[in-house]
Amino acid sequence: MDRRTFLAVATLGPAVGTAGCVAGGRVVQEQQQSILVEPGRGWTNEISEVDGDGELSYTVRAEQRFDIYYFTSTEAYDHYRAFLSGEEPPETPAGHSKFSRAGVHNEDRDLYEAKAPSDGGRASISVEDTHYFVVDYSNYGMGVPVEEHADPLDAFVDLAVFENTLPI
């Protein structure tokens, strides 16, 4: 990861931390880390700490193309895992449409980027079951094609999950 990318991502930390206080939410999960994903695999983060309604915000950046899948049920995630294991699941759920997307080339940064919401704020979630946030580097679901002998995906993940604390 080059210096510009690191500095751009590092400046988001304080903003995300104070946003939880200003908007009335409590940060229950935060990931800010570089990840390495082998071709044909995915990196998963389980989201289960939210008690009822909450909010989610993420930005993922990498030099290679990738997909983001956000599964709202263990059953949907199990289909994804089965696919990665070489099985042929009966279906390949695309994940929640509000959060699942392909990384798009950002001309200014010369990196691929996926973020939700697209304005950099937060989007509402309701966690009844464990949710799964996946940075995918496989050929799952007709997403971004990945060659078998491609280099590993080197990405930076900035993921924040908030629990609503305002009275209704």
For the regions a protein language model found, what residue spans apply to each?
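Terminal disorder- and signal-encoded targeting elements
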Residues: 1-168
